[in-house]
C-alpha cells in the first residue's frame, strides 16, 4: 500500500492475509496472467510489519505456487523482512519450496530515518539504492544449491541511484554474483 506523510509518498508493503481465500484469489490471478504469458512467477515481498507469524509465509507461498507457478526469490526482500520482523531468514528458506525458484533477485537498501515512526525505530528499506549487503550475499551462496530450476539472477538498482564512478562497484557486484552462481553449479 502507499500513503502520504508530510508531503512525502510512503510505500510500506502490507502482507496479504494468509487465508485459503487469499490463496484462491492469487492463484486465479496468476492463472489469468498465465493465459497470456506462458510462465508466470510470484515474487516474495519485503513486508515491513506483520501481525502474524512471518515464518507462516513460506507455507502460504507454497500453496499459491503449487505445481503450476514459479517463484522469483528476492533475497533482499527476505533480508529486509527478517530484519524488520525479527526472524532467521534461513528458517524461512527451509520452509519454502525452492524447486519453484526460476529467478533470484539481489538488491540493496538503506535504513529509515528514525523520525518516520513515533517510536524512533528504524526499518530496513528495500529501496534498491545501495550495494547488496553482506547478509544477502551469504543467503545467495546458501540457497543456490537448493534451487535446481534456477534460470536467472537479477541485480536490481533503482534508476538514478548510481553516482558517477559507482559503475565500477556495480560491475564488481555483478562479477561477484556470477562467481557465486558458478561455484554453486
What is the predicted role of each segment?
Residues 1-2, 46-48, 77-79, 108-112, ...:
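Active-site-proximal loop/turn and secondary-structure-junction residues that shape catalytic pockets
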Residues 1-70:
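Active-site acidic/histidine proton-transfer and metal-coordination neighborhood
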Residues 13, 17-20, 81-149:
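Gly/Pro-rich active-site loop or hairpin
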Residues 26-34, 58-62, 93, 137-144, ...:
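Generic structural signal for well-ordered alpha-helices
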Residues 28-40, 67-69, 139-152, 180-184:
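A structural motif corresponding to the C-terminal end of an alpha-helix
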Residues 40-43, 69-73, 102-106, 151-156:
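Hydrophobic faces of well-ordered beta-strands that scaffold small-molecule active sites
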Residues 163-185:
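C-terminal helical cap(s) of enzyme catalytic domains, especially alpha/beta-barrels
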Amino acid at each position: 500500500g502507499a500513503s502520504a506523510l508530510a508531503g512525502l509518498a510512503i510505500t510500506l508493503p502490507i502482507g496479504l492475509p494468509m487465508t485459503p481465500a487469499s490463496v484462491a484469489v492469487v492463484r486465479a490471478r496468476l492463472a489469468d496472467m498465465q493465459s497470456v504469458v506462458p510462465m508466470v512467477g510470484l515474487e516474495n515481498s519485503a513486508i515491513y510489519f506483520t501481525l502474524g507469524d512471518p515464518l507462516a509465509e513460506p507455507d502460504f507461498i507454497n500453496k499459491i505456487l503449487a505445481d503450476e507457478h514459479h517463484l522469483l526469490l528476492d533475497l533482499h526482500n527476505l533480508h529486509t523482512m527478517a530484519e524488520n520482523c525479527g526472524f532467521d531468514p534461513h528458517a524461512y528458506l527451509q520452509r519454502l519450496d525452492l524447486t519453484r525458484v526460476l529467478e533470484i533477485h539481489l538488491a540493496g537498501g538503506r535504513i529509515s530515518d528514525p523520525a518516520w515512526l513515533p517510536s524512533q525505530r528504524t526499518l530496513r528499506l528495500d529501496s534498491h539504492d545501495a550495494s547488496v549487503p553482506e547478509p544477502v550475499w551469504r543467503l545467495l551462496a546458501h540457497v543456490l544449491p537448493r534451487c535446481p530450476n534456477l534460470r536467472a539472477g537479477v541485480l536490481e538498482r533503482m534508476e538514478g541511484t548510481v553516482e558517477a564512478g559507482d559503475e565500477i562497484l556495480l560491475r564488481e557486484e555483478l562479477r561477484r554474483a556470477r562467481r557465486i552462481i558458478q561455484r554453486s553449479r
